[in-house]
């Protein structure tokens, strides 16, 4: 294919043309390409295929809902039963007490919904200077304009003629609480609307929080009247062995952002859980209550909501959140054993999501390309790391086989020459 019609996401098109992998079917934790290759999905696609691919009961739910009503919006006076049922279910499992639910079409939508809402909230309560959003270096918060602007991945903000598409953002060190404190002092708490963070940083290289980090961050947020947003687009719905990572890491967010695992990828859906402090001004002032002017065409989509409900039922019925916690222990053991490899600089884990970070002399992208030949789909992350985050239905041995393949590929990546610790570029 020399000139494809499809412009792939996040792709250097001249490099991928002619080497694209066309995935045509899946079953469980495996995918099949148009060449007949059967590949283990070691990343659960983009962190979301938690219950595995091509479950017939999910297809049946979609079919039955479409036969009744495929979609209807939830703007103004209108609503629908599936959106109501899903919202009630999410409230019942939320780490936030008595939240309200805003539904939309995915993670990037949800980030924009959360960030716009905190700006609107502060204006409503008369604190109109509180506009700045603080995030962490190397963080990823989607690719809509606001998410791109707050992201800590510099390469996602480059090329648009300004540091931020939306003004009023700042980034702090991902581990250093002191940097956050200094940034509050520099910008002024009276100007800061919110702090946003992934409980476990994903695309930035799978960085779990250091002990005590979020306790101190939350203390500073409370003391300085800064709203705290937990971006659980990746970690939500079992990825860290709890339904939400906020529970595991004892977070008390004002807003939780979710997507991905809420449907396990069977339909596009995301949303936010909003704490009473933030939602009350929009509900409890009668005629003087403001309207939050936000919504998407497919907010509360019936088929997506029905699939989310079935997905949550499957997670509970099959004990897959507990299974994720058990798989974390297997993955942790395997990562510990690979950490001593000559080409590995670190192996990190936070829930059933981990990464193998490689030395600069070898390319994570090249290793992930080679792993496809061994039957495993992985993905390069920031920091020259390899993403590992399989579905929750993965077998213990499949985790071991995956890490065995990583070791084999690293073992066969021979340096051109070696002089003590100084090495030439690796040829693989």
Give the ranges of each region predicted by the language model:
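Conserved N-terminal phosphate-binding loop of PLP-dependent enzymes in the Aspartate aminotransferase
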Residues: 1-428
């Amino acid at each position: 294919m020399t000139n494809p019609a499809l412009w792939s996401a996040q792709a250097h098109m001249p490099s991928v043309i002619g080497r694209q992998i066309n995935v045509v079917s899946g079953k469980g934790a495996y995918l099949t390409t148009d060449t007949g290759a059967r590949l283990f999905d070691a990343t659960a696609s983009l962190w979301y295929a938690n219950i595995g691919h091509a479950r017939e009961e999910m297809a049946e739910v979609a079919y039955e809902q479409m036969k009744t009503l495929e979609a209807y919006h939830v703007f103004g006076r209108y609503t629908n039963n599936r959106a109501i049922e899903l919202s009630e279910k999410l409230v019942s499992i939320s780490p936030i007490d008595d939240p309200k639910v805003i539904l939309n079409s995915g993670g990037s939508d949800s980030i924009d919904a959360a960030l716009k809402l905190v700006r609107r909230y502060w204006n409503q309560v008369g604190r109109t200077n509180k506009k700045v959003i603080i995030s962490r270096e190397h963080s990823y918060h989607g690719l809509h304009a606001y998410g791109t602007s707050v992201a800590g991945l510099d390469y996602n903000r480059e090329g648009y003629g300004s540091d931020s598409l939306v003004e009023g953002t700042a980034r702090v060190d991902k581990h250093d609480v002191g940097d956050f404190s200094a940034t509050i002092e520099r910008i002024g708490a009276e100007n800061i609307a919110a702090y946003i963070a992934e409980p476990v940083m994903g695309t930035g290289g799978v960085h779990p929080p250091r002990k005590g980090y979020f306790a101190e961050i939350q203390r500073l947020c409370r003391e300085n009247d800064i709203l705290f947003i937990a971006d659980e687009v990746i970690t939500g719905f079992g990825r860290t062995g709890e339904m939400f990572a906020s529970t595991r890491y004892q977070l008390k967010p004002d807003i939780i952002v979710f997507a991905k695992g809420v449907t396990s990828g069977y339909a596009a859906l995301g949303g936010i859980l909003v704490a009473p402090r933030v939602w009350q001004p929009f509900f409890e002032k009668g005629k003087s209550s403001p309207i939050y002017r936000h919504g998407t065409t497919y907010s509360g989509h019936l088929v997506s909501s029905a699939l989310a409900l079935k997905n949550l039922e499957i997670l509970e019925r099959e004990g897959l959140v507990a299974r994720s916690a058990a798989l974390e222990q297997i993955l942790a053991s395997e990562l510990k054993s690979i950490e001593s490899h000559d080409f590995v600089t670190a192996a990190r884990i936070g829930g059933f999501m981990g990464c193998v970070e490689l030395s600069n002399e070898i390319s994570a992208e090249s290793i992930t390309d080679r792993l496809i030949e061994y039957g495993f789909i992985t993905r390069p992350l920031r920091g020259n790391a390899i993403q590992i985050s399989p579905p929750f239905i993965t077998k213990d041995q499949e985790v071991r086989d995956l890490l065995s393949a990583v070791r084999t590929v690293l073992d066969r990546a021979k340096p051109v020459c070696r002089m003590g610790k100084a090495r030439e570029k690796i040829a693989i």
